[in-house]
Each structure stands twice: as C-alpha cells, then as structure tokens.
C-alpha cells in the first residue's frame, strides 16, 4: 500500500496557489479580458450577419 504523507499533492498545491489574493486578481483580469474579447467578436459576427458589406 502507498504511504500516507502530509505533503499536499500537485492538485492541492495548485488550488492553494490559486486561492492567494494576488493570483485571484490576475485570474479575474484574464477572465475579464477573455469575456470582453468574446463580446467584441460576437458583435462583429452580428454586424457581419446583418450587413455583409460592413467592414
């Protein structure tokens, strides 16, 4: 059987690292930029669908 040690495994360390406020702020910034980019792409698709000669 495998030994039980008190060291956190890779997943637990990654979750603890993401829980730090500095990393949460960076993650929020990246998520906000991705959502903004998706919104802009969606508007471009809508405009191109409504008016094919635009752009």
UniProtKB/Swiss-Prot annotation:
Topology with respect to the bilayer: Peripheral membrane protein
Compartment(s): Cell membrane
Major site of localization recorded for this protein: membrane
GO BP: proton transmembrane transport
Keywords from the named record: Cell membrane, Hydrogen ion transport, Ion transport, Membrane, Transport
Function: Component of the A-type ATP synthase that produces ATP from ADP in the presence of a proton gradient across the membrane.
Name by which UniProt lists this protein: A-type ATP synthase subunit G
Complex and partners: Has multiple subunits, A(3), B(3), C, D, E, F, G, I and K(x); there may be a few other subunits as well.
Lineage: Archaea, Methanobacteriati, Methanobacteriota, Stenosarchaea group, Methanomicrobia
């Amino acid at each position: 059987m495998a030994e039980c040690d008190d060291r956190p495994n890779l997943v637990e360390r990654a979750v603890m690292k993401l829980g730090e406020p500095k990393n949460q702020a960076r993650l929020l910034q990246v998520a906000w930029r991705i959502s903004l980019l998706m919104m802009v792409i969606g508007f471009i698709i809508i405009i191109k669908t409504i008016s094919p000669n635009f752009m």
